[in-house]
UniProtKB/Swiss-Prot annotation:
Gene transcribed to yield this protein: GSTCD
Protein name: Glutathione S-transferase C-terminal domain-containing protein
Family: Belongs to the GSTCD family.
Lineage: superkingdom: Eukaryota
Keywords: Cytoplasm, Phosphoprotein
Amino acid sequence: MKGIKKSLTEEYLYLDFSHQKEGCIFPLHTSVTLFLLSYCDCTVFKVFLVLPGESTGISLLKNVPSEGVEIQTISRQELPPIVQSCCLPAVVERPDNFCRAGLAVVLRHIIQKSYEADPSKKEILELLGFKKTCLKACAEVSQWTRLCELTVPLAVENFLKESFDQPPTIPAAILELEKKLSEPVRVHNDDKLRRQKLKQQKAAGVGPSLAKEKTKSKGHRQETSEEGDSSSASLELKVAFSKLTIHKEPASANREPSYVRKAKASDLPPLDHVFAEGLYFTLADIVLLPCIHHFLVIICRKLSGKLVEFPLVAAWYQRIQEVPRVQTAASQCGIQFISLPELQTTSSQQPPNLDEAPSAEEQNDPSFIGGPRPTMTKLMEKGIEVMFSPHPCPTWTLDWDTLPAAVSPKEGKMSSDRALRKQQQLNNLVYMVTNQAKPGDRIVDFCSGGGHVGIVLAHVLPSCQVILIENKELSLIRAKKRSDELGLSNIWFIQANMEYFTGMFNIGVALHACGVATDMVIEHCLKTRASFVTCPCCYGFIQNTSKVNFPKSELFKKTLSYKEHMILCRFADQTAVQLPPQRRLIGKQCMCLVDLDRARAAEEHGFSVQVISMEPESCSPKNNMIVGVPI
């Protein structure tokens, strides 16, 4: 392929392959990955289909995604050890110590490598969206990542397995996508585009009140015959498809009319979706297309009357076929697009509200009193008080002067004062880990960032395997560079969300894992029966998620409501050095109570747990450690 750089590192892409039915490759994560390879015309990876168990007799794919892609089959037992510890899809760089795992991470990497191989393909890089953040955040944080990576593929797979003996219901994930497509678009140049749309509507004779009425029904985007629709829809389409062409029209130098310039933001018409996330074709559309296609094939074949329940999804499916190269890529992957009947919605046919309704407790809790003191008093009445376990060795420290320079956090591009505090934090964690570690143990540094904890542990514990897990690619690359300088051979680097690490380990460690990430680390350790040493951070970001609920322990659940627990979390964040001493003291006490809840929850799972203050306490405003050992 033209423009390929000969110096590109050889990488191996591993995809699950269970079976292929009617052109649909299962699991759908594999279908999505192969579709992206075809769309990008990417040939820089050696692709392996990982067969279930020890299977070897499964026939190869009928539709190879690209002529230059080399595809082989492999059993799970033949996978490199680092890949065996991860969920697929996964990409590994030689010498098999740097792995990227999880659908979103792998797809973003394919896009970046395709662009590196041929920098003339700037439209490929545009798939990552504004500021290159499309599907970058983990599913726990981003609704779009959760929808594209988890809920839609899983929902469609389950739907395709149904026998339809009983009238089926449309999967909630599809209805959630329909709801998102009905929401106004938010883009970085939102105000400018909405003013352009106002100008278009005026030129078409559509008044503001009529325009607002029309936006209540998103089905009007589908080329209905009503006056002004084609004009109002043309702005979004023009902006969307201009991103997909090489030559863009120059911006107009004429000043906008006064009614456009002076219009209030509240009077501007909203922007409608052209593609999944808004106006621009992104990786989210690539992920959704194979899933929605196979879903619609079944719907049209057996349940065509159900199409009226998701007209915006159907319109998106037809619109996406107009994107350059989508037809070619789909054909190479065995996707034969189907024609859908024209659908319309009325203002009375709005997508259902799928937002979780607040619980009765959250809506009406007459006993709730704001502020930390009433909550702390309530706990004290139940015998729950601020209590720290003594530090087992407060004066212990690494001999930093004798360690190689690359081991020190000073190599991580930080000020000398901050580097000193980071060394003090590491002294605490390293002592706790080395006190428990045995030769041959696996130690996982979750949310590893630049690898400050993991690199020190790998250096001082050469007989242990250390695994760094981090979602941010640049942080992990910096950590690998430091590791290479030290010549460490007992360290792995995994770019993934922590739930995609499925390997066994003996000790889990996390320094300043943000918000619920600390709880996810502890949960991971509880399931694996591994010891843990965590230092929580960002208490103010703690909230209920799809996987974690607060309070966590039965003791705290019987005493505090969710709101009261959130009060503790909010005030636990108020420990900055510039705050008044009394306020910091209350913050420290709230930190302890939040962490005691975490500790008691772990004890309920058969662990011995302590909440300990780091020494010296000045090493960080967030200086609690939660140390747990399975009993």
